[in-house]
Amino acid sequence: MELYVARDKDGILTLFPCKPYCSESGIWYGETDGRDLVLKKDMLPEVTFENSPQKIEIALIK
């Protein structure tokens, strides 16, 4: 499953089902109806505002 993760200018980390867009104020928004998921700020420290959004792949481990 491919998703996108992006960090806002204020450090909020969000997971999106579709590629998000960034507002002029530095906040990432998805084109979905509230299916975005806010993650803990300390997760994925390699994702910064400057390199967002990042495409990630999630796999179930059995």
Across the structure, where does each feature detected by a protein language model lie?
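Short, surface-exposed terminal/edge motifs of secreted or surface/virion proteins that either
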Residues: 12-22
